[in-house]
Amino acid sequence: MSNTTMATSTILLFLLAGLAAAHGDGDTTIRLPSDGAKASRPRAAKPWDCCDNIEISRLMIYPPLYRCNDEVKQCAAACKECVEAPGGDFNGGAFVCSDWFSTVDPGPKCTAALDGLSMERPWKCCDNIKRLPTKPDPPQWRCNDELEPSQCTAACKSCREAPGPFPGKLICEDIYWGADPGPFCTPRPWGDCCDKAFCNKMNPPTCRCMDEVKECADACKDCQRVESSEPPRYVCKDRFTGHPGPVCKPRAEN
């Protein structure tokens, strides 16, 4: 065999070996994510930790959109669009996070939150109660009900504009520090709490509660038994326009 023939055979041998390696073991199975992989995207972090100059979008959606217009030395890590503020207050420049964020509660103020802190509850009742993401004991609460201007200014030290046409209703900015945030103003058909609330994106939202309970609340008009439940469990099929209320604590007692 000539040297040319041997060289050609060697090259063909290497090419065939490379093709075999590229094809692998012949397994053409499409690999799906493992059972432990997360199927849903993680909840986005708020682009600010606190905010004094909060802006509410005029879009009538729920949860509403907020933007923080505070000028800061450095934007929060979660901020995606951090822009330089013209004529900033800080030496070396100031920045503003221009992100819009969808949330029920935009969070506490940075410098004035303690001004509205009270050990006495500013409201007699509240439909849209919000527990603040702080860790004191007792907890801190804010009522996000939309009130007539005269109601808000009479009961609260600080009020802010509610989403919607201007001028319009106001929301109390005061923070209550106590164990009991008070009763609802409008009774929910399912009672004071709900673990499985489903709401649309309107503002205010229309909600229903799919909790299976021993008995429906007195305010429920359409109480239906869960099929094949033993002992019997019930679900209130009523719909309610407004905040669904807090989750039930502890869940095991539902």
Swiss-Prot record:
Sequence repeat positions: 46-120, 121-187, 188-251
Propeptide segments, given as residue ranges: 23-118, 252-254
Extent of the signal sequence: 1-22
Protein keywords: Disulfide bond, Protease inhibitor, Repeat, Serine protease inhibitor, Signal
SUPFAM superfamilies cross-referenced by the UniProt entry: Bowman-Birk inhibitor, BBI (SSF57247)
Gene Ontology terms: cellular component: extracellular region
Cysteines engaged in disulfide bonds, as pairs: 125-185, 126-143, 152-159, 156-172, 193-248, 194-209, 199-207, 216-223, 220-236
Swiss-Prot/TrEMBL site (Reactive bond for trypsin) positions: 135-136, 201-202
Molecular-function GO term, any one: serine-type endopeptidase inhibitor activity
A Pfam match: Bowman-Birk_leg
Entry-linked InterPro entries: Bowman-Birk_prot_inh, Prot_inh_BBI
Entry similarity comment: Belongs to the Bowman-Birk serine protease inhibitor family.
Protein name: Bowman-Birk type bran trypsin inhibitor
Gene that this sequence comes from: RBBI3.3
